[in-house]
Amino acid sequence: AREMLTGDLGVGRVIARPFIGTWPNYERTIRRHDFSLAPPRQTVLDALKAEGKDVIGVGKIYDIFEGQGVTETYPNQGNEKNMEKTIEIQKKEFDGLCYVNLVDGDMIYGHRRDIAGYAGALTQFDKQLGEFLANMRDDDMLMITADHGCDPGYTGTDHTREYVPCLIYGKEIKAGVNL
């Protein structure tokens, strides 16, 4: 099957998304699995690993990169548990990157157009973000971004066209500086 995914029309991954329930009351479970192809060239994860840095993946990071460049992984358990794991990792000594994927806003609420669920997930993340920020060391850097929009108030179930933010924070990062 992997040979079929390469060439001019190649894809990076095939996603298996299990559902529970029956129509129209079915829902996705967190037990998804990505069958990925290895990245075609070196990634930032590979470069960090080659320098002896920790590359810790939380959520589906290992799956997305087929494990390439990842030194430690914690599979997806949903946003709240993924943030709990991230805060646990943050409290340990490590030197490198902790790459976290919080997929609930997209997978569970965005595509299903569940505005109340989406708002609840953001509220929960906001609470945990406060704890994360309080634990940041002076030389830590936090980057928050997304790969696409998924407005739960829009029609249909596809991705939407919002601009994707890139928020960067660190106690030693100066405002207005080109990173």
Language-model region placement:
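Feature captures the catalytic ectodomains and active-site-proximal regions of enzymes
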Residues: 1-179
